[in-house]
UniProtKB/Swiss-Prot annotation:
This is 33 kDa chaperonin. One of its GO terms (molecular function) is protein folding chaperone. It comes from Streptococcus pyogenes serotype M6 (strain ATCC BAA-946 / MGAS10394). Disulfide bonds join 235-237, 268-271. Redox regulated molecular chaperone. Protects both thermally unfolding and oxidatively damaged proteins from irreversible aggregation. Plays an important role in the bacterial defense system toward oxidative stress. The gene is hslO. It is found in: Cytoplasm. PANTHER family: 33 KDA CHAPERONIN (PTHR30111:SF1). The keyword Zinc applies. Under oxidizing conditions two disulfide bonds are formed involving the reactive cysteines. Under reducing conditions zinc is bound to the reactive cysteines and the protein is inactive. GO terms for cellular component: cytoplasm.
Length: 290
């Protein structure tokens, strides 16, 4: 089961979140049939949103949009504060690797664009923030958002490793934030440790990668685990929701679906689930509108 572990240094100088998101990203790949680069880009976005949602309280919903002008198109993710996330990428078929190393490429195919977050607190006044894409690698773009928009300097690591068949092998990430009151000496020590950390791809390849991430972040500094919470890919779409959407269409459009297509098929963008509405279903919707 995927999980996020929240911890804090006993000195109170920093906090760290580490995530295992392997099942989340694997299910997203399965549902959207993404190729290598698209899988990694979508996976990193989902992990970023899991971190962002874990930082919220109440029943907030958080939308992350990575909007580029190159091959990927838009990547959209929605998460809640209960550990659920869903998402999709416009172009599922990007599959580019470095010839020499086999490294999956992401940044060069994101292009210029923006990292957009929308936090809906359920009050009818969602908070929206937009920052430019810095590298297109998503982790750096997320860190820039946290620094610029939330005024919280953060170290971020996100990645998805694929097996020889380009299926998700492991996915996860971390966030480290210095807390108010940390001394200059403590800040310098944590910065040095982060700079000397192995690459996240190396840490994720470890047998117990969540523990490996925590150990690399904290080193010999004593820390306390605050919580361990489950994470999952879960879509909240339903037949009833799409039926309500059909109810908003003009009768003429619904009748055209009956006459020309003998029904309608609606596919959820977030999870790929298909909902069929036959002629009788559409006629009932038309009658309900009368």
């Amino acid at each position: 089961m995927d999980k996020i572990i929240k911890s804090i240094a006993q000195s109170g100088a920093f906090r760290a979140y580490v995530l295992d998101s392997t099942e989340t990203v694997a299910l997203a790949q399965e549902k959207h049939n993404t190729l290598s680069s698209s899988t990694v880009a979508l996976g990193r976005t989902l992990i970023a949103n899991q971190i962002l949602a874990a930082n919220q309280k109440g029943d907030s919903k958080i939308t992350v949009k990575v909007i580029g002008d190159s091959s990927f198109g838009h990547i959209i993710s929605v998460a809640d504060t209960k550990g659920h996330v869903k998402g999709y990428i416009q172009n599922t078929g990007v599959d580019i690797k470095k010839t020499a190393t086999g490294e999956v490429l992401v940044g060069p195919f994101m292009g210029n664009g923006h990292f957009v977050t929308i936090i809906d607190y359920g009050t009818g006044n969602p908070y929206t923030s937009t920052t430019p894409l810095i590298t297109g690698e998503i982790g750096e773009d997320f860190a820039y958002y946290l620094t610029e928009s939330e005024q919280t300097p953060s170290a971020i690591g996100l990645n998805v490793l694929l097996d020889e068949n380009d299926k998700v092998k492991v996915a996860g990430g971390f966030m480290v934030q210095v807390l108010p009151g940390a001394s200059e000496e403590e800040i310098a020590r944590y910065e040095k440790r982060l700079q000397e950390m192995p690459a996240i791809s190396h840490l994720l390849a470890s047998k117990n990668h969540v523990d490996a991430l925590l150990e690399a972040i904290c080193g010999d500094e004593p820390y306390k685990r605050l919580s361990e919470e489950p994470l999952s890919f879960q879509c909240d779409c339903s037949r009833e929701r799409f039926e309500a959407a059909l109810m908003t269409l003009p009768k003429a459009d619904l009748q055209a679906m009956i006459d020309e297509d003998k029904g309608a098929e609606i596919v959820c963008q977030f999870c790929g689930t298909k909902y069929q509405f036959n002629e009788s279903d559409l006629e009932a919707i038309i009658n309900d509108k009368a």
